[in-house]
C-alpha cells in the first residue's frame, strides 16, 4: 500500500518531529547539536525553510518551521537529515539508519502555533533537565526570551501567510 502524500502548506508554520532510530541517542554532544543546527540552517536557507522554533533532545528533535514552497520542507529535511546521518555514522564508524522512519509534520494555525512552540520549548523542563526553558541551550526558548546565546539565532523573516 502506498503511503499518503505529506500535507505541506507554503507560508504556514509546521510542527516537525523526528526521532532517532530505535530511540537511540543521536544528539549526545554539543558538537553533534552544533552540526545539526548548522546543517538545518544551511539547507533551510538553500531550500526556503524558515526556522521559528526548535528543541534538540538526545534522541529526537522538534522543529517549528515555515516552508516557502511545497517542496521546501521535504528538500531541507532530506538534506539535513541525510548529511547528519553521514556525520553520525562516520563518527561511530557505523552504517545504517540513524533516523526512525519519516519525519512527522503538521501544518499549524495561529493558536496551534503558540501551543506547539510552548510544547517544543518545554520539552527539557518536562524531562527534568532544567527548571526554566530558557536555561536549556539547545532550544529556541532563550532566543524567544531575548537572550542572545550562541546557537539560538532564529529565522526572523519567515513569512507566515495571513499574519
Where are these regions (language model features)?
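Short Pro-Cys-Gly-centered "Cys-loop" motif that presents a nucleophilic cysteine in a tight turn
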Residues: 1-57, 66-163
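Glycine/serine-rich anion-binding loops at beta->alpha junctions
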Residues: 60
Amino acid at each position: 500500500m502506498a503511503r499518503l502524500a505529506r500535507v505541506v502548506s507554503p507560508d504556514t508554520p509546521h510542527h516537525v518531529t523526528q526521532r532517532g532510530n530505535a530511540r537511540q541517542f543521536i544528539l549526545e554532544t554539543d558538537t553533534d547539536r552544533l552540526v545539526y543546527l548548522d546543517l538545518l540552517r544551511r539547507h533551510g536557507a538553500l531550500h526556503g525553510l524558515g526556522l521559528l522554533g526548535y528543541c534538540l533532545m538526545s534522541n529526537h528533535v522538534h522543529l517549528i518551521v515555515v516552508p516557502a514552497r511545497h517542496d521546501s520542507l521535504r528538500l531541507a529535511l532530506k538534506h539535513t537529515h541525510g548529511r547528519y546521518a553521514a556525520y553520525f555514522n562516520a563518527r561511530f564508524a557505523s552504517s545504517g539508519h540513524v533516523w526512525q522512519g519519516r519525519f512527522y509534520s503538521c501544518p499549524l494555525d495561529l493558536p496551534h502555533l503558540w501551543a506547539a512552540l510552548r510544547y517544543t520549548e518545554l520539552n527539557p523542563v518536562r524531562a527534568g533537565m532544567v527548571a526554566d526553558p530558557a536555561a536549556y541551550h539547545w532550544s529556541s526558548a532563550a532566543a524567544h526570551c531575548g537572550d542572545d546565546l550562541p546557537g539560538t539565532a532564529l529565522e526572523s523573516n519567515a513569512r507566515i501567510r495571513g499574519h
